Design a protein with these regions (language model features):
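Solvent-exposed loop/turn segments at secondary-structure junctions
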Residues: 47-50, 86-89, 121-125, 156-159, ...
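Short, motif-level signal for alpha-helix interfacial/capping segments enriched in acidic residues
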Residues: 25-30, 61-64, 200-216
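Extended active-site neighborhood of metal-dependent phosphoesterases/phosphodiesterases
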Residues: 92-183, 203-220, 232-287
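N-terminal export signals
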Residues: 1-4, 9-30
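Short, solvent-exposed aromatic-acidic interface loops
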Residues: 288-292
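Short acidic, glycine-rich surface-loop motifs adjacent to enzyme active sites
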Residues: 179-195
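Active-site neighborhood of phospho(di)ester-bond hydrolases with catalytic His/Asp-centered motifs
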Residues: 44-45, 80-84, 115-121, 187-188, ...
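N-terminal active-site segment of His-dependent metallophosphoesterases
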Residues: 13, 28-97, 173, 180, ...
Length: 292
């Protein structure tokens, strides 16, 4: 599949005919429709709180703008998941803690009770996630919601981009308690597949996680890190990335070095948004909601 797959092309490649946008099809979808358990959640990612630079002259207002956009949704999501890079990294421990404290204060204004987090490398890569865990709790966990099993992975606390054998064993044990037909949703910061390793858009042992997930019939992965919408299939598993809340990156490999897309003063906040992921009876249908 192309490195840069947008929503319409993904639908065609996945054989979904523009009707749904997910890997989670079949019996689960019919069961959801019958039980009235349809719901949606919001994925927010890469807020980089504390960033200052020409890539976003409105950096101090962008996260607050995103919170306001989510609060303005006609219907409240069942929960919100932040998929990492909550803050912009710094080697200064006091400043990093200050940014985490400020981030928590801003997102406390979200009008949704259930707000969850996983780390990005900016949050956890400098100290193996120790400060993140103090401020936000454990970095990998699972939970169940309306018939769906959700798994939050940490593929950033190891600064070399590994999930690690202990966490992979935890993933295997966690999933083994569930039927192969139960829908599984995985959250991670980095992509689990090799999207573009030259730009660090990969997880070095992500293939092992995909191998663990492959026996399950309905698996969808939501991730961040690449600051743009992207959709990919590994076998039956669908992978969907979120836009950033601070700056967009260009398409993978479109320029020699990875650098932010320059700020466009005529279209401020272009390419910044969050994901609304809706169960539509026949699966999850993610859609990007701009904050502009």
């Amino acid at each position: 599949m192309s490195l840069n797959t947008k929503r319409r092309d993904f639908l065609k490649l996945a054989g979904l005919g523009g009707v749904v946008f997910a890997s989670s099809l079949g019996p689960w979808g019919r069961a959801l429709a019958a039980s009235g358990q349809d719901f949606f959640f919001v994925q927010m990612s890469d807020s980089h709180w504390g960033f200052e630079g020409p890539a976003n002259p409105e950096a101090k207002n962008t996260l607050k703008r995103a919170v306001a956009a989510v609060n303005a949704l006609k219907h409240k999501p069942d929960f919100i998941m932040f998929t990492g890079d909550l803050i912009h990294g710094t080697p200064d421990d006091k400043l990093r803690q200050q940014r985490m404290t400020e981030f928590k204060a801003i997102v406390a204004d979200l009008k949704v009770k259930d707000v969850r987090f996983i780390p990005g490398e900016n949050d956890a890569g400098l100290d193996n996630g120790e400060m993140y865990k103090t401020m936000f709790g454990v970095s990998n966990y699972s939970f169940d919601h309306k018939g769906v099993h959700f798994v939050a992975l940490d593929n950033v606390s190891d600064p070399n981009g590994f999930i690690g054998e202990n966490q992979l064993q935890w993933l295997h044990t966690d999933l083994s308690r569930h039927d192969k037909a139960q829908p599984i949703v995985v959250f991670a910061h980095r992509p689990l597949f090799d999207l573009y390793p030259a730009w660090d858009w990969a997880t070095n042992d992500g293939a092992k996680a995909i191998d663990i997930l492959t026996p399950y019939e309905n698996v969808t992965v939501f991730y961040g890190h690449i600051h743009q919408e992207h959709h990919h299939m590994t076998g039956k598993i669908a992978h969907h990335s979120a836009e950033s809340l601070m700056w967009p990156f260009p398409l993978a490999g479109s320029q020699p070095k990875r650098s932010p897309v320059p700020w466009d003063s005529t279209h401020p906040f272009k390419g910044l948004g969050f994901t609304s992921a809706q169960t539509a009876g026949s699966g999850f249908e993610p859609s990007i909601k701009p904050i502009a």
